[in-house]
C-alpha cells in the first residue's frame, strides 16, 4: 500500500491532524504523532503577528524534532505579509506551509482573512 505524498513529503500513514485553534499546540501535536498521525498541523498563525514580531505568535511556531513531518498554517490577506510569514515558517522548520482560506470565525473574517480571503484573486494567483 502506498501512502500519500504532499509535494516532496512522503507520509508514513493516512491519519492527518487538522489544525485546531487553541488545541493543536506543540504538546498535542507530539502526542498525535506518537499515536499514529502521519502529519500534524499547528493551529493557524497570524501573518501580521509574525510581521510585527509578536512573541506569542512566534511561540506558536515551535516544532519538536520528533513530530516531522509538520505543517504550519498561516492566515492573512496581504500578499507581502503572507510571503514574509511563509518564509518565517519555513525558517522555523515547517515541512509544509498551509494557507488558511476556510476559517469562518467572525474575528478572523472581519479582517478579510480566513474564508473571506477566498474571493481575493490576488492571493490565489500563486497557488501551487
Protein language model features and the residues they cover:
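Glycine-rich, positively charged N-terminal anion/phosphate-binding segment
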Residues: 2-5, 20-95
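Short, solvent-exposed beta-strand edge segments and adjacent coil->beta transition regions
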Residues: 12, 67-69, 112
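Conserved catalytic motifs of the protein kinase core domain
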Residues: 12-13, 37
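Conserved small/polar residues in nucleotide/adenosyl-binding loops
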Residues: 121-128
Amino acid at each position: 500500500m502506498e501512502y500519500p505524498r504532499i509535494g516532496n513529503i512522503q507520509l508514513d500513514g493516512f491519519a492527518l491532524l487538522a489544525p485546531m485553534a487553541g488545541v493543536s499546540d506543540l504538546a498535542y501535536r507530539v502526542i498525535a504523532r506518537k499515536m499514529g498521525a502521519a502529519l500534524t498541523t499547528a493551529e493557524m498563525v497570524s501573518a501580521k503577528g509574525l510581521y510585527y514580531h509578536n512573541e506569542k505568535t512566534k511561540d506558536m511556531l515551535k516544532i519538536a524534532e520528533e513530530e516531522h513531518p509538520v505543517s504550519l498554517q498561516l492566515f492573512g490577506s496581504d500578499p507581502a505579509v503572507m510571503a514574509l510569514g511563509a518564509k518565517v515558517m519555513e525558517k522555523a522548520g515547517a515541512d509544509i506551509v498551509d494557507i488558511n482560506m476556510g476559517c469562518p470565525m467572525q474575528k478572523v473574517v472581519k479582517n478579510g482573512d480566513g474564508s473571506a480571503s477566498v474571493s481575493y484573486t490576488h492571493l490565489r494567483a500563486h497557488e501551487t
